[in-house]
């Protein structure tokens, strides 16, 4: 028999110690990984609930197991809230991750070996947009587009040329490291010109879209996927959205279950429903606007200090720092900043001479620092400290000095109050 007051501490001290150390790391480090954020206590509470015990293969009202009457209510609420939040007619809240949501779209719309056109990983795309190390580049014939060398923005003329030349069955719009506004309609027009599906992955900007601060692709694309964490600030998971199309909805549902997954994670779906309600509530638009403002302040400060920001700035929550002209690798920059309690991730940049394991850039994002209360003043100061480290990357005294400042800033702005 289990009791609600059972504790990990005292039973599994090894796990508990690692958990406590991670709590301390999150409190004492500034988090600038663009795909990370801090969920609300409500979201975490749902994920630690007894819902984790329930198997519920199928969909609300059409389950393969009994005893699903209450989890049906939860999943339907998550579906309805997702549709309201993004103006969709269809929503599937079951994907365990963004990559699994993307895999379901591929499975629903394509046959193995068919051609897809997606953004190059080195130019800001995602593994699942056609990278050769991903299912998307192994099972399907992937063609890649990139950024204009002069503007650092998506080269729509190249997209149109590649689409005409290769006749893909599906075009993927979306990114994991692109800082400008994507012209969804331009992609729609290109897809229509060759009779291709338009699939948008808005995982990184879903929170901004929900707040009305970034163009919504749902009315334009055939299908849209997103994660539920990142800017959306919910649990780690995936979501598929679409306009009214009964045949497409059936294909997508079947591609998620039974083709791609078995039982849904009902505790995570409950957390998604809570996250969607939070996004529909007061203060959410202001939060997302601050995310953008902080990113712009950081990008501007980097440029003032002589650093190259890919695409020349940002319109969302992230940007890429190109370190090629500084003679610094992303790997070394990541490690040095880590010693200063600043967490970033190394990232490939356009025309990167380094391997993906080394890189010549950093990806920087502001959702997490905004969640813990950082404003423009803190964002500018933090950027200056990062520049101090990168300007003298081997100077451990500089790193120690910056770490002290970071610890002080973190103490004043706790992750959870």
Curated annotation (Swiss-Prot):
Keyword Signal annotated: no
Cofactor or coenzyme needed: pyridoxal 5'-phosphate
One Pfam family matching this protein: SHMT
List of residues binding (6S)-5,6,7,8-tetrahydrofolate: 121, 125-127, 355-357
InterPro entries, per database record: PyrdxlP-dep_Trfase, PyrdxlP-dep_Trfase_major, PyrdxlP-dep_Trfase_small, Ser_HO-MeTrfase, Ser_HO-MeTrfase-like, Ser_HO-MeTrfase_PLP_BS, SHMT-like_dom
Pathway per the UniProt entry: One-carbon metabolism; tetrahydrofolate interconversion; Amino-acid biosynthesis; glycine biosynthesis; glycine from L-serine: step 1/1
Alphabetical keyword list: Amino-acid biosynthesis, Cytoplasm, One-carbon metabolism, Pyridoxal phosphate, Transferase
Subcellular location: Cytoplasm
Principal location: cytoplasm
Subunit structure: Homodimer.
Record's function text: Catalyzes the reversible interconversion of serine and glycine with tetrahydrofolate (THF) serving as the one-carbon carrier. This reaction serves as the major source of one-carbon groups required for the biosynthesis of purines, thymidylate, methionine, and other important biomolecules. Also exhibits THF-independent aldolase activity toward beta-hydroxyamino acids, producing glycine and aldehydes, via a retro-aldol mechanism.
Protein name per the record: Serine hydroxymethyltransferase 4
Source organism of the structure: Colwellia psychrerythraea (strain 34H / ATCC BAA-681) (Vibrio psychroerythus)
The encoding gene: glyA4
């Amino acid at each position: 028999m289990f009791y609600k007051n059972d504790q990990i501490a005292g039973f599994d001290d090894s796990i508990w110690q690692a958990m406590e150390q991670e709590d301390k790391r999150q409190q004492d480090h500034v988090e600038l990984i663009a795909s990370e954020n801090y969920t609300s206590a409500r979201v975490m509470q749902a994920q630690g609930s007894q819902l984790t015990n329930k198997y519920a293969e199928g969909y609300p009202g059409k389950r393969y197991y009994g005893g699903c009457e209450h989890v049906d209510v939860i999943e339907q609420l998550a579906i309805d809230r997702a549709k309201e939040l993004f103006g969709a007619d269809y929503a599937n809240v079951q994907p365990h991750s963004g990559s699994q949501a993307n895999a379901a779209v591929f499975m629903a719309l394509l046959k193995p070996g068919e051609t897809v056109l997606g953004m190059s990983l080195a130019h800001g795309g995602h593994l699942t947009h056609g990278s050769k190390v991903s299912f998307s580049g192994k099972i399907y014939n992937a063609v890649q587009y990139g950024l204009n060398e002069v503007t650092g923005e998506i080269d729509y003329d190249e997209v149109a040329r590649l689409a005409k030349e290769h006749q893909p069955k599906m075009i993927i719009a979306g990114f994991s490291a692109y800082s400008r506004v994507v012209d969804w309609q331009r992609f729609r027009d290109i897809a229509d010109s060759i009779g291709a599906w338009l699939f948008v992955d808005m995982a990184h900007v879903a929170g901004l879209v929900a707040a009305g601060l970034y163009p919504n692709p749902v009315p334009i694309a055939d299908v849209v996927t997103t994660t539920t964490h990142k800017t959306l600030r919910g649990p780690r998971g995936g979501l598929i959205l679409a306009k009214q199309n009964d045949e497409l909805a059936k294909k997508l549902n079947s591609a998620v279950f039974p083709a791609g997954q078995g039982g849904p994670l009902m505790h995570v779906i409950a957390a998604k429903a809570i996250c969607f309600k939070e996004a529909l509530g007061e203060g959410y638009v202001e939060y997302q606007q601050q995310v953008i403002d902080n990113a712009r302040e950081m990008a501007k400060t980097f440029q003032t200090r002589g650093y190259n920001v890919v695409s020349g700035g940002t319109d969302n929550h992230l940007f890429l720092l190109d370190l090629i002209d500084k003679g610094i690798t992303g790997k070394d920059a990541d490690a040095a900043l880590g010693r200063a309690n600043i967490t970033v991730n190394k990232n490939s940049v356009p025309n990167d001479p380094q391997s993906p394991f080394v890189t010549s850039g950093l990806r920087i994002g502001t959702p997490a620092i905004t969640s813990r209360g950082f404003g423009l003043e803190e964002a500018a100061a933090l950027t200056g400290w990062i520049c101090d480290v990168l300007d003298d990357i081997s100077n451990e005294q500089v790193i120690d000095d910056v770490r002290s400042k970071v610890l002080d800033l973190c103490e004043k702005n706790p992750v959870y109050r």
